[in-house]
Amino acid sequence: MKKLFTLLTALLLTVCTKALAQGWPQNYDGVMLQGFYWDSYDDTRWTTLEAQATELSAAFNQIWVPQSGYCNTTHMQMGYLPIWWFNHLSAFGTEAELRKMIKTFKSKGTGIIEDVVINHRAGNTNWCDFPTEKWNGKTMTWTLADICANDDGGKTKANGYNVTGAADTGDDFGGGRDLDHTRQNVRDNIKTYLSFLLTDLGYNGFRYDMVKGYAAHYIGEYNTSANPKFSVGEYWDGDVQKVKGWIDGTRANGSIQSAAFDFPMKYAINDAFGQGRWGRLADATLAADQAYSRYAVTFVDNHDTGRPKENGGAQLYANVLAANAYILTMPGTPCVFLRHWKMYKQSLKRLIATRKAVGLTNQSQIVKAEASANGFVLCTQGTKGKALLLLGEVNNAQTVGYQLAVEGPKYKLYVSDGVDLTAVKAIKGEDAGFNAPDFCKVKKDERCAFFEAPANWNNTITCWQWDKGYNYTGGNWPGAACTKVGTTANGTHVWKWTWNNSKQASSAGNEGIIFSNNGSPQTADLPFENGGYYTVEGLLGVVKPVTTGITSPLQSTPSAKSLPVYTIDGKALGHPADIDTALKTLPKGVYIIGKKKYVVK
């Protein structure tokens, strides 16, 4: 009788656990890191990530990594054409290194999210010969009946492969063979694979790639079987109703089974922070909807959107840190991009610590979301107080009852007076920042910009610069010719555009700057910053006008008093008698003196 009771209890617990698998935890206060970008083979090596486990785990609760299965090569392969499901040698390291990394992060309280690619596969030696694999007493076999009959628009059949699966239940993918999810064999193999990822390799959850490629209800079936703690789908669409429809479509046993990336918010972020259309932040998104914010994974950029426009990207080129401050103050689960983490690490640490100090979660209430002509005001309610974020140029916001927690270009984040900011204030050091080549000079009152051209742009670089009233580059495309001012250590040429004090009337609805290879190819429309240093990736930083040998890019020198001096990486150098003494005696470099940044040239 006792054994029967124990068995029934175990079965009941199993059923309850399955029933609670609802895509993403409710009231979740975690922050996620996308631990890779396109071709990040060095930065995302399993050993490289593991070496940073202590630092990363202090900020992030989940880290999303690339698809780790073997793709018949370990060279320049991101994993999006999977071949082997149970062999995890990859361009990022060995399977042993992967297992060790996952275990190390788990010991520090951080889970690893696997990029799961089950819309399509690649063959082992030809288009369709998926390998037979064994795991846990099960053998996975495949036939041509497991591939959609209309795969690759009929090209697969036309090339002699008699695929006999059903028609695709979603969008076609031309790069690999689309799996027929209506087939029981396909679904059984996928369930075995997902179980292996969780129970054998130790992954904590799934990021499903290209979920537009098959019907949403299959995600519900797979997650009900595998029971991941975390699941998020890449439903790449700016229409919030379509993304909500996909989330609802994952329901199984009456419950939603997966979150989704908030692409509607991503496009609103691009317009607001990239073009000054602040009202877009008040538009409908997953995170702004109380009914769906639990299932919203918000982001500024990812490995796909962060690529150049000609490669299908939709990158944010300006005010990137301010945009990260926005997602870290909103409901939803924020996912920080590795490139942004590397560039703005210390500021992001402070923003994340502030989010946790206030007690913001994926289901926090939005108290206020209001646009003005030059900025946006956001107020959200956490479990320990309120967060008040001022974006752009907001000068009339009421901050009585709030204390300033973090500030930077185009943003100020306040929290309720009673919130404990000890953890935020304990984070020392400054961001890696940007240092332009020494040959980049800006004269007082000069209107100019610099462009580091790609190596294959061989013509004279031209510039097209405008605002809502005027064009400053002649008014005829491709604009004004730039002057080559130097070559970087990497061998790329840097060009400078300087305004010649003539302008033509313009009726543009925005303002910006474009550089081109004498017309084509060209950059995207980039936000104009006077003295800005640009690449095809966007604005890297601003070169300040040269006045003396010692400049302070952030603020003028305060009155003389003894203040601590730190290097840019946070190392204390001592307490000089006053700032003037420090600036005269320190070697060339960037220093933090009295919480302000100074450049000694």
Give short role names for the model-derived ranges.
Residues 6-15:
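Bacterial N-terminal signal peptides
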Residues 22-38, 48-57, 67-69, 74-81, ...:
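Active-site-proximal helices and loops of the catalytic beta/alpha 8
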Residues 16-21:
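Sec/Tat signal peptide C-region and signal peptidase I cleavage site
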Residues 74-83, 120-162, 224-225:
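Aromatic- and acidic-residue-enriched segments that line the glycan-binding/catalytic groove
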Residues 93-134:
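Substrate-binding cleft of carbohydrate-active enzyme catalytic domains
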Residues 22-45, 172-179, 183, 448-452, ...:
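Boundary/entry segment of secreted carbohydrate-active catalytic domains
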Residues 548-601:
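C-terminal outer-membrane/trafficking sorting elements
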Residues 454-505, 520-525:
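Aromatic-rich carbohydrate-binding modules that target alpha-glucans
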